Amino acid sequence: WQGDRGNAAAEVILDEKAEDLELIADPVMNEKGNLSEGIEVRAEFQKWISTYTGSNWIPEPRSYRLPEAPKGDKSYSADVIYGSQMEREKLLEKNGRIIQPIWITVSTTQDAKPGLYSTKIRVRTEQGGEQSLKLKIRVLDLKLDQDNEYYLNLWQYPYASAAYYQVEPFGREHLQIMKRQMRPYMEAGGKIGTASIVEEPWYHQTWCDYPSMVRWKRENGKWQFEYGEFDRWTGFLLKEVKVSYIECYSVVPWGNVLRYREDGKEIEKQAEPGSEFWTEAWSAFLQSFVQHLEEKGWFDRMILAMDERPKEEMEAALNLIATFPDRHGNSLKVGGAVVHYNKEMWDRLFTVTPHLSALANEEIPQELFREIVRRRRQEGKLTSIYSMIHDYPGIFSMSDPGEAAWTIWYIESCGADGFLKWAYDAWCKDPLEENVHCYFEAGDMFLVYPGERREKEPDVRVSPRFRMLEEAIHDVRKLCQMKKVPEYEKKAEQLLDSVRCFYGKGKSNGVGTAGFMEADEQIKRELAEEVEQIGRAHV
């Protein structure tokens, strides 16, 4: 379509050792041989990285700091769309052959002229050898609406990039890096920002630290709060990334541990929701936070978020938050990634996000969920679906990138407003070399990669998984446009109704599988056929 983006893939196979490789995308030409306008083709090598699938479970109790990932049982995944130059040492050689994947992205502007176009993708070796492939592009006389109403929510870890590039968190240099790093998220439809209001909201489940953007202090029995980093990050998200809302984690963090400074000492204290200490501490915070947000004009943009917390803890938080309204009597918005359906709880939440399995396993019947979404939408509330570890299809390094597309289509078939996933950029120590996690599937922690530290202006590198996620969001937006045309409304709905749920049988672990869910070969073939069928249906 016009104003669209699509993807293609290729491979270079070399029977003998090569030196550095170079990739060139020739100018795009129309059928008359004239240079086209409004069509951009990017061809980039994919970089192989070491992956480890993990055990796909978190032991309880677990240590605050993650253990090292096991050294063995690793594989390789071409998960980084790296660039047009590939140095010899980055090539992967096996049995005397080099297999080098290529990712091709085609973007069209709103005023690209409909028609058939072509270009050549050329690969050169340092010795002067060259091979090429012809790429044909058909631009349809259809415009993709520029208004992107899809609610994509990929949790961000800005401290990870500050640590990777060794810059001051939220300083000028860091925010310049983050501006480039968040561009793919914004272009894909990212609508939600992520902020921390306590130390390690997820009990340090990543290699990188996630400190609190709000500094908690208690001096002479009185609570004090410093918002410097929170303000710089919030201002950046609202101005540069143009998010609609910012989720603040969390009134009920994993582990229910509150860390703060008291009389010059670092204190770590258990704070069970509803307890006397928890109520005292969070009452002080909420009173301060509401006042601060009103002064900054941000009150309506904030969501106090909770992630997979028990019903009793969420109720305690909701009850306390309601006692600290703004000057107009409005309470802060509250949201949550929830495991089970509870009508009373869901009615109190501005954002509700059940796990994909709740729909797939019919714990929440699809028709009921669609009705809930419609009702909540009329009330101005948001309803999304999230995926996580052990899902098949999944969005991991060892997953077929098409599984990311299926995920978006399946969620759309359920009627949700959007998709949530942990995480966008929770990098490990050396993400351009390996993306391991001791517990989770490789790639679950991030969908984008950093630039090389030696680069003058390091730019983010995305994964094929991210590109297919983005392409599927474009497909969903096209279907939404088609529904507005009477003659296509029923066809669009039938197409979405045809999306089936593919879940495999349980398996504890194994490189190349998606956690507990491993599909048999028939399901894999059927999924591949469905991805192709739905992807072509828009033509």
Located regions from the model:
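Active-site clefts of carbohydrate-active enzymes
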Residues: R376-W406
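Extracellular glycoside hydrolase catalytic/binding regions
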Residues: H328-N342, W346-E363, G394-E412, D425
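Catalytic domains of carbohydrate-active enzymes that cleave complex glycans
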Residues: V257-Y260, E266, Q270-V339, A416, ...
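Substrate-binding cleft of secreted/luminal carbohydrate-active enzymes
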Residues: I395, D400-F446
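Short edge beta-strand/loop segments characteristic of extracellular beta-sandwich folds
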Residues: A9-I13, T105-S107
